[in-house]
Amino acid sequence: MNQPTSSNNGAIKGVQKIRTLIEGLDEISHGGLPSGRTTLVSGTSGTGKTLLAIQFLYHGIKHFDYPGLFVTFEESPRDIIQNAHSFGWDLQSLVDEGKLFILDASPDPDGQEVVGNFDLSALIERIQYAIRKYNAKLVSIDSVTAVFQQYDAAPVVRREIFRLVARLKHLAVTSIMTTERLDEYGPVARFGVEEFVSDNVVILRNVLEGERRRRTIEILKLRGTTHMKGEYPFTITNDGINIFPLGAMRLTQRSSNARISSGVETLDKMCGGGFFKDSIILATGATGTGKTLLVSKFLEEGCRRGERAILFAYEESRAQLSRNASSWGIDFEEMERKGLLKLLCSYPESAGLEDHLQMIKSEISEFKPSRIAIDSLSALARGVTNNAFRQFVIGVTGYAKQEEITGFFTNTTDQFMGAHSITESHISTITDTILMLQYVEIRGEMSRAINVFKMRGSWHDKGIREYTISEGGAAIKDSFRNYERIISGSPTRIAVDEKSELSRIMRGVQDKTLPE
């Protein structure tokens, strides 16, 4: 039996990783990309492959002082520098300082004809020369597909890519090599062989879900080391690629026993003294049941106590929100003038869910609020899959809890009267407190009802109470004690005789349980 060979230099080390400092990538890769190895980044057109390759080099040079080499087969060095400048990355200064070298291997615009045996010997030698001359530690190659687009023989492609990868490994550089694929969920790469000669494979996707594009990243393999499995959404911002590693989030947030007021005294009593600080509250109900009013009272109460608050509105404009709040005696404009309130209004269709999530996180990070509200979640759910929407809600709630912020969200149900589910997207388990608002028909008149459907970690009132809206705002009255089946949407009045009979039966049961 063969025994493992020993080295005089000490024990064999495992795969070392180099941090990329790309937001979220180090989390899903469990520490970064494997050092001294090549990572294949594959994706269709417009997925962000070139951007990832440039950002990887730029961060390595700026944060770790690793010299870098960028090999381009498609764009000119001028275009690459100009495009990177849009993200605030000054590649030209790095080139002038000798920290970055851009090797132009783009094809002749007049075209080339392949004659004889095809190989990359000359190109590999050019890359090796540049690596040694500039002492490069990081290399990005964009993209190998352009090299082989005139030569479709898979065995030749596999052989030449293997030679290139082997030479890069011999030179001990950490490299990214981009390649194109034809379908989002088809073969990993165009020629079907690239992934087999690479130690690491990352797939970028840009999928049309409903009416919106959704970018995701998946680490298919990192040979010899661990990584997170599955697809993770990402967006492209002014700072580059931003990945949301929702699966990397841990349920380690602190929980506070402190209570905060909802702004409605009776609702505070129904919740055992108010909402828990850093909890997530969901108000769900049909349109017009008073969800936005509860949100407005919640924000007003925070500002009255000198706390900062943000309202992310996706159904009403700033002017409309201010006008409606004013009719309830709430002055949003005065709160904004004092710097306590921020109203951010936009259409849900103006951006993808990942872009909305990034905007929410950025605004929270900048404004530092104690309370946030989203009105409404159901507007954001339009035109996206349930899984994508649930990931968005997890991202928002997780970040709010991490920052110890109390969140109040609304959800509009399709059911006008009665209720079959709390939300259509099954996000109720993510929230801590659920307020159910609905219409009920009592004696030929339409009334509103409210009840605390759920509240984690606290006693709460189980009654279904009447909820009225007037110029003074919200008022919660007594329970509908003489009615049953209100939640089902078919309230039935309990007759006095029936109540007496029930009382008689209960007294009889109690008498039987008394000792003789």
From Swiss-Prot:
The alphabetized list of GO BP terms reads: circadian rhythm; regulation of circadian rhythm; regulation of DNA-templated transcription
Q: Which is one GO molecular function term here? A: protein serine/threonine kinase activity
- Record-listed Phosphothreonine modification sites: 429
Q: What is its EC number?
A: 2.7.11.1, 3.6.4.-
Q: Which residues of the sequence carry a binding annotation for ATP 2?
A: 287-293, 328, 448, 454-456, 458, 460, 462
Q: Name one Pfam family in it.
A: ATPase
* Gene that this sequence comes from: kaiC
Q: Which UniProt keywords apply?
A: ATP-binding, Biological rhythms, Hydrolase, Kinase, Magnesium, Metal-binding, Nucleotide-binding, Phosphoprotein, Repeat, Serine/threonine-protein kinase, Transcription, Transcription regulation, Transferase
Q: How does it assemble?
A: Homohexamer; hexamerization is dependent on ATP-binding. The KaiABC complex composition changes during the circadian cycle to control KaiC phosphorylation. Complexes KaiC(6), KaiA(2-4):KaiC(6), KaiB(6):KaiC(6) and KaiC(6):KaiB(6):KaiA(12) are among the most important forms, many form cooperatively. KaiC interacts with SasA, activating its autokinase function and leading to RpaA activation.
- Catalyzed reactions per annotation: L-seryl-[protein] + ATP = O-phospho-L-seryl-[protein] + ADP + H(+); L-threonyl-[protein] + ATP = O-phospho-L-threonyl-[protein] + ADP + H(+); ATP + H2O = ADP + phosphate + H(+)
Q: What does this protein need as cofactor? A: Mg(2+)
Task: Give the originating organism.
Answer: Picosynechococcus sp. (strain ATCC 27264 / PCC 7002 / PR-6)
Q: What is this protein called?
A: Circadian clock oscillator protein KaiC
SUPFAM superfamilies per record: P-loop containing nucleoside triphosphate hydrolases (SSF52540)
Note describing how the cofactor binds = Binds 2 Mg(2+) ions per subunit, one in each domain. Mg(2+) is required for hexamerization and phosphatase activity.
- The UniProt record lists the keyword Acyltransferase: no
- Record family assignment: Belongs to the KaiC family.
